[in-house]
Amino acid sequence: MPDSWDKDVYPEPPSRTPAPSPQTSLPNPITYLTKAYDLVVDWPVTLVREFIERQHAKNRTYYYHRQYRRVPDITECKEGDVLCIYEAEMQWRRDFKVDQEIMNIIQERLKACQQREGENYQQNCAKELEQFTKVTKAYQDRYLDLGAYYSARKCLAKQKQRMLEERKAARQEAAA
């Protein structure tokens, strides 16, 4: 159906209400109010905002590039040095978050490869699968059984237990 019709064939019926006269003796106050609002409020605010945006565009700060200096490990802290222990704990927490992000990235790569390759993912994604297993093993060795109240001290104790178990297994292998 066409959007417009032939006005010669189908004329519009005459309107029963009189057409409003656009010319009045009094001007419309709403137009004056909107112009006054634009000049008094909107224009200065827009001008200031554009100025601020230009200044921010010149001096853009990239927050994700913040680099923290490495602090000593908790094993290097003296026994009563609370500040050193606190800094080592915060460094360990940052390392923990970085390791979590690395795990997420490797997992996303493996999922993308599995999605892309379909049923043949074990053959075609062997490199990603091997990398994922290595990273997962290292992550689990370090952080798996720390519990909800994890800390650098608990992680260090877990690492010590793991090293003792490895030494014991190596001694038993050498003896056998």
UniProtKB/Swiss-Prot annotation:
It comes from the Eukaryota. Residues 1-10 have a biased composition (Basic and acidic residues). It holds the Pfam family NDUFB10. GO terms for biological process: aerobic respiration; proton motive force-driven mitochondrial ATP synthesis. Its main location: mitochondrion. Complex I is composed of 45 different subunits. Interacts with CHCHD4. This is NADH dehydrogenase [ubiquinone] 1 beta subcomplex subunit 10. It comes from Mus musculus.
